[in-house]
Amino acid sequence: MEKGKVVVLEDRVPKLKERRRQKANRRLIAYLSFFFLFILCVLYFQSPLGAVGHVEVSGNRHLTAERIISLSGITKRTSFWKVNEQNVEKKLTRHPEIKEATVEKQLPNTIAIHVREWRRIAYVYDRQTFFPLLENGRLLKQEGTKTAPSDAPVLVGWKDGDAIAEMTGQLAELPAAVLGAMSEIHYKPTREYEDRVIVYMNDGYEVSATIRQFADKLSHYPAIAAALDRNVKGVIHLEVGSYFVPYSPPKKEDGDETTSP
């Protein structure tokens, strides 16, 4: 009979105790690490380090960065980690001038806000005040200014809301270069053309057109103006076809005086 191996238990007991002690130490270290990490997190969230440190705003044109930050509801006391991007975006797009908004968190404590504003397609002149008209047809009656704008044409003599709405749609279809070349658009209906308008261009010409064909006709304005003698000003008629009538006699200084078609 083969003799079996003899295991000396006294030799294994110290090793088992050492393993148990090491295992207990590792467990204690893990518990202590978790505890201190928890304490650090609590201190971080309660300290200024856990609050929003900076808000960056981009894409705004007419609304100031301060106004947009105020609309977002974010302050220096706001917890960085409690900022909900989607909720802030919804708050911002409730403003009539903001078309789109994107909010992004950037470590360690910066909030980046990018907005797209509705384009100001024109300004309605009423009671010596210029009211912005957005491309979506909304008139900003609370944003009126006494200073004449230069970024969009001014609508003068427009009282008919339906006519303004139709004109807004036409202006929105125009290239930016043509829209920027206009100074004023006067509502001047006649018996023959009930939707007739007179456009005063920045280059000194006048354009007589109708609202219903405004975008289609005015989109060709650069080519039409380029074919004319720049030293001879007058009225470009675009109601039916297109033709040019020079001022005769020379145009007076009265801004409301126009040449009848």
From Swiss-Prot:
Residues 231-260 are annotated as: Gamma. Residues 50-118 form the POTRA domain. Pfam families: FtsQ_DivIB_C, POTRA_1. PROSITE patterns: POTRA. One of its GO terms (biological process) is FtsZ-dependent cytokinesis. Residues 118-230 are annotated as: Beta. The keyword Transport does not apply. It is a single-pass type II membrane protein. Keywords: Cell cycle, Cell division, Cell membrane, Membrane, Transmembrane, Transmembrane helix. Gene3D superfamilies: 3.40.50.10960, membrane protein fhac. Its main location: membrane. Residues 47-117 are annotated as: Alpha. Residues 49-261 are extracellular. InterPro entries: Cell_div_FtsQ/DivIB_C, DivIB, FtsQ_DivIB, POTRA, POTRA_FtsQ_type. Residues 1-27 are cytoplasmic. GO terms for cellular component: cell division site; plasma membrane. The chain crosses the membrane at residues 28-48. It comes from the Bacteria. It is found in: Cell membrane. The keyword Zinc-finger does not apply. HAMAP family: DivIB. The extracellular region contains three distinct subdomains: a membrane proximal alpha domain, a central beta domain and a C-terminal gamma domain. The alpha domain might serve as a chaperone that stabilizes FtsL. The gamma domain is required for interaction with other divisomal proteins. The beta domain might modulate protein-protein interactions of the flanking alpha and gamma domains. Cell division protein that may be involved in stabilizing or promoting the assembly of the division complex. PANTHER family: CELL DIVISION PROTEIN DIVIB, CELL DIVISION PROTEIN FTSQ. Belongs to the FtsQ/DivIB family. DivIB subfamily. This is Cell division protein DivIB. It comes from Geobacillus kaustophilus (strain HTA426).
